[in-house]
């Protein structure tokens, strides 16, 4: 078993940064663009299981083929996911109580979801149950540097760090050793991981929560995060964040991508 940081796929067939910027506030878009690129050369044999599919936006941009099943416990987002057409089937259910039989799916993924789940051990165990033996399971989560690299914490201290953790709903910002133990208990082997998203990128994301307020008002009044999705309108934003959207693995990256496999 190789748990060392590994090289990531290098696949640039799509301009994921522009595609994400068209629909999302920039501080979410440039992180999702990095993550979209990672899946391009990863094997996802069908049937595929997406744990925490949300509104389906990420899958609709990341994958050319429809994902077999998207599961999410939240009523609003999963019904919104229908409009993207990225899934063959959508299921509203808790990840700890999946309605599928054991050994059903040939692969699975969970993109930037597991860090938000309080009952993480139960969800991982249930995910392992519905995956076939040797099925790959891919996921990405923030690590400890997600919180330790916050710029405003240097002035306001731990109170701000805890506040930021709460507003971003992060329950688990842990290092690979912790995730490896969780996965082992649930029935997975951890094959590879890499850190990504530099501390500087994390600070751009942090400040984006405040500079991105106009997008919130646009969403409230128009139903869209971005009013004008044209390339010329997004050129300056893309030019600025592109230098922070590198997919290269970094020793001090603030997020971690994992490749696990069902035992």
Feature names for model-found ranges:
Residues 179-194:
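A SAM-dependent methyltransferase catalytic signature shared across enzymes that methylate proteins
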Residues 107-118:
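A short SAM/SAH-binding and catalytic strip from SAM-dependent methyltransferases
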Residues 154, 192-263:
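A C-terminal cap/extension of S-adenosyl-L-methionine-dependent methyltransferases
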Residues 1-101, 107-109, 250-257:
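Conserved N-terminal segment of class I S-adenosyl-L-methionine
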Residues 117-122, 149:
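Short N-terminal helix/helix-N-cap motif within the alpha/beta-hydrolase-1
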Residues 138-161:
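Conserved class I S-adenosyl-L-methionine
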Residues 160-178:
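Acceptor-substrate binding/catalytic loop of class I
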Residues 121-136:
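A short glycine-rich, Lys/Arg-flanked "PGG" loop and its adjoining helix->strand segment in the class I
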């Amino acid at each position: 078993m190789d748990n060392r940081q590994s090289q990531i796929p290098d696949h640039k067939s799509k301009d994921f940064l522009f595609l994400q910027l068209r629909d999302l506030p920039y501080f979410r878009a440039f992180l999702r663009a990095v993550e979209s690129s990672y899946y391009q050369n990863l094997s996802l044999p069908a049937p595929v299981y997406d744990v925490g599919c949300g509104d389906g936006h990420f899958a609709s941009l990341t994958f050319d083929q429809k994902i077999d099943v998207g599961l999410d416990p939240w009523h609003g987002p999963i019904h919104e996911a229908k409009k993207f057409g990225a899934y063959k089937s959508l299921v509203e259910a808790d990840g700890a109580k999946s309605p599928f039989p054991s050994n059903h799916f040939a692969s699975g993924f969970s993109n930037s979801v597991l860090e938000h789940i309080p009952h993480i051990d139960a969800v991982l165990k249930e995910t392992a149950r519905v995956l076939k033996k040797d099925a790959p399971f891919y996921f990405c989560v923030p690590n400890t540097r997600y919180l330790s690299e916050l710029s405003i914490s240097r002035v306001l201290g731990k109170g701000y760090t805890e506040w930021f953790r709460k507003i971003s709903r992060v329950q688990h910002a842990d290092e690979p050793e912790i995730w490896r133990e969780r996965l082992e208990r649930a029935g997975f082997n951890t094959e590879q991981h890499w850190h990504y998203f530099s501390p500087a990128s994390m600070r751009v994301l942090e400040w984006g929560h405040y500079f991105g307020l106009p997008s919130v008002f646009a969403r409230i009044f128009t139903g869209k995060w971005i009013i004008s999705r044209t390339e010329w309108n997004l050129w300056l934003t893309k030019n600025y964040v592109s230098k922070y959207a590198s997919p290269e693995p970094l020793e001090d990256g603030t997020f971690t991508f994992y490749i696990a496999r069902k035992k």
